[in-house]
Amino acid sequence: MQAQTFSHLHSQSSQRTTEVTLYLTIPESYRQEPIVTQLVSRYQLQVNILAATLGTNGGQGQFKLTLIGHAQAINNALAYLEQLQVTIVLDQESDGW
């Protein structure tokens, strides 16, 4: 999913705290990488894991997460995930605030 899907986060102050709930599908090639941890350490986000599915013998990982932090930090984190070719789907119940 492209970053413009999350453009509503750009329209407010980058220092305003916001939250967004989304679904991630992480490719198998990143199975051993600390991708969710990077969202906390690199982007100073609070991450709430609402659901997760990982295959026991490999495969992709699927997560439902709530990200809480400054709008700019969330956008930067989403750009990082897109660089990794993680599939991002915004939860339609989430309004980003």
From Swiss-Prot:
Cross-referenced InterPro entries: ACT-like_dom_sf, NIL_domain
Domain of life the protein comes from: Bacteria
Coiled coil ranges: none
Gene3D superfamilies hit by this protein: 3.30.70.260
Any one Pfam family match given in the protein's UniProt record, by short name: NIL
Function according to Swiss-Prot or TrEMBL: May have a regulatory function.
Protein name: Uncharacterized protein ssr2439
